[in-house]
Amino acid sequence: MPKLLYLSVSPRAENSYSRQAGARMIAWLERRHGPLTVIDRDLAADPVPHIDGAMARASLMPAADRGPAEHAALALSETLIGELEAADIVLISTPMHNFTVPSALKAWIDHVVRSNRTFRSTPAGKVGLLADRPVLAVVSCGGPFHDGPGSQRDMMTPYLQYVFGSVGITQVEVVRMENMARGEDFVARGFERLNAWTGSLAIRAA
């Protein structure tokens, strides 16, 4: 049975359009691939703490030199990396906050993007140490992305693609549901965009 790691990020619970989209995506994936084992990581209800000094020190220490305190400091990071390693597909449902990922998702990223654990630094740049797999990101945006008044830049899509790529995961697909704060007509268009996007996806679960 394929394993899905589902990262939900919005603090708006049932009022969240990204969470509604995430639920639709899980149903779509199950229609396509059959039953899934879902690793449900709700980063709003159960937030991952930001990196503290103990973890920063432990992560920079050679593995052979770590003692019980360092292993304890890295325990949550190891759990989160293990969930990512176990997943055949990763699904992220998230709003865009101030042009990029919410801090709750950034904290998760900081725990899983770790030197000499999920990537290795070389003179040519970072080399990912994880196996590739599909990452599907559904992003709910309050405003538009186009040239003209009120538009904003998308710095989130290239960031997600780059950060997952740095650990070896290159199959990153992102859909933006735009103008979701502008009324029911725009919300309907956002979900139409989601439906069109899922129809164009070509992914394979293990």
Swiss-Prot record:
Catalytic activity: 2 a quinone + NADH + H(+) = 2 a 1,4-benzosemiquinone + NAD(+); N,N-dimethyl-1,4-phenylenediamine + anthranilate + 2 NAD(+) = 2-(4-dimethylaminophenyl)diazenylbenzoate + 2 NADH + 2 H(+)
An example molecular function term from Gene Ontology annotations: electron transfer activity
Coiled coil regions in record: none
InterPro entries given in the database record: Flavodoxin_fold (IPR003680), Flavoprotein-like_sf (IPR029039), FMN-dep_NADH:Q_OxRdtase_AzoR1 (IPR050104), NADH:quinone_OxRdtase_FMN_depd (IPR023048)
Keywords: Flavoprotein, FMN, NAD, Oxidoreductase
Cofactor note: Binds 1 FMN per subunit.
Record EC number: 1.6.5.-, 1.7.1.17
Any Pfam family hit: Flavodoxin_2
Class in the EC hierarchy, top level: oxidoreductase
UniProt: FMN binding residues: 10, 16-18, 140-143
Cofactor(s), names only, from the UniProt record: FMN
PANTHER family given in the database record: FMN-DEPENDENT NADH-AZOREDUCTASE 1 (PTHR43741), FMN-DEPENDENT NADH:QUINONE OXIDOREDUCTASE (PTHR43741:SF4)
Task performed by this protein: Quinone reductase that provides resistance to thiol-specific stress caused by electrophilic quinones.
Subunit comment: Homodimer.
HAMAP family: Azoreductase_type1 (MF_01216)
Family to which the UniProt record says this protein belongs: Belongs to the azoreductase type 1 family.
Protein name: FMN-dependent NADH:quinone oxidoreductase 2
